[in-house]
Amino acid sequence: MKQPTTNKLRFTITLVILFLARVGIFIPISGIDHQTFNNTIQQNGIINFLNIFAGGGFSTIGIFALGIVPYIYASIIIQLLIKLIPYLENLQKEEGEIGRQKINQLTRYLTLLWALIQSLSIAIWINHMYLIHLFELCASLTTSSMIAMWFSEIISEYGVGNGPSLLIFQNIISSIPKNLQNYTFNIGTTNTVLNGSLILSFGIIILIINILIQEGERKIAILSAKQLGKINELNHKVIFLLKLNQGGVMPFVFASAVVHTFLFISNNTNSKITQFINLFLPNQFLYLPLYLIFIITFSYVYTSLILNPEDIAKNLKKMGASIPNIRPGSETIKYLNTRINRLTLIGACFLFTITLFPTITYYIFKINTLKGLGATSLLILVGVAIDTAKQIQTYLYHTYDNMME
């Protein structure tokens, strides 16, 4: 009967930490004119993009303004370096738990460095003239970012769900009531019911596409030497799964980063290059085709980093397994490469479709409720909700099994 108590403790730890992380966003750092700062950042696309993941922390420069963002970026960089540096790749694959701990420690160090860089950039951007205020701001933001990282690790180990994902989920979903409030405040038109119904329909379509992307898989049958030796086991198929969207939200993140870089260059320079860049900015005809190209490109790049057909073929060979009607070796690699490329293209097109719906909703109804969420946010919300629900279901199954025993 210990399992139910353990589950209660997991849920309690998760809820308490999420509450503390949310409260920290609203504790302002002293020495800043927050009203003036909030008015300034409204036109800054990069800050608004980060503000979504900070749950509004950038609008007030609360102590948790950076939140989990430095840890997320550090984790992304480490994952990329693992694929590029053989030592780190060997550390992850061959060293087991010790290697995992070393990689986690590297991620923490990089998080600290990234938090220092981001906090210093914010302090300089605010134009703090006094050294003591600059130091106070950097120390507050960096320390709180490390606390947020610690919170996320506690949730992952002792709570329910993935810690970093839940913190981002909480920050994103907290912006929805404000968007809905802005919508209900402006419902003075005669077509409110029709517009609301159409927006609800768009929302359901987006939700369905998100679930298809998150849960979409390509099943590939695997036949092992053990199965060939036992006729009874031939009926029990071993399945190898390829996800429709291997890159997750990363194609969105990279594509958005490039677009915001273009926007930054356009706003801060004045040359012939700027005039050319302006053709690809939001609200321009070439923006969506360019964004589609970026999403497809980054989907292929990121998928190639996290999923290598050669490694899969080698592992199958080590296990004495193969794909039916496909010879081991080069034919298996070619077969997997073809399937992965097709899935990546389909997944990238689905991702682009998600980006279209909030934009279409905004231009048709002039309502930024969905547009404010963004495609990245919607994908994260659905993905985290599905993963957390699966973990909760697993805990409940274990509880039920123990009670039956």
UniProtKB/Swiss-Prot annotation:
InterPro entries referenced in this protein's UniProt entry, alphabetically: SecY, SecY/SEC61-alpha, SecY_CS, SecY_dom_sf
One GO cellular component term: chloroplast thylakoid membrane
UniProt protein name: Protein translocase subunit SecY
Annotated localization: Plastid, Chloroplast thylakoid membrane
Primary localisation category: plastid
Keywords: Chloroplast, Membrane, Plastid, Protein transport, Thylakoid, Translocation, Transmembrane, Transmembrane helix, Transport
Description of how the protein assembles with itself and partners: Component of the plastid Sec protein translocase complex, which is composed of at least SecY and SecE.
Topological type in the membrane: Multi-pass membrane protein
SUPFAM superfamilies: Preprotein translocase SecY subunit
Coiled-coil region(s): none
Ranges annotated as spanning the membrane: 12-32, 61-81, 112-132, 149-169, 193-213, 247-267, 285-307, 345-365, 367-387
Function of the molecule: The central subunit of the protein translocation channel SecYE. Consists of two halves formed by TMs 1-5 and 6-10. These two domains form a lateral gate at the front which open onto the bilayer between TMs 2 and 7, and are clamped together by SecE at the back. The channel is closed by both a pore ring composed of hydrophobic SecY resides and a short helix (helix 2A) on the extracellular side of the membrane which forms a plug.
GO biological process per UniProt: intracellular protein transmembrane transport; protein targeting
Pfam families (alphabetical): SecY
Family: Belongs to the SecY/SEC61-alpha family.
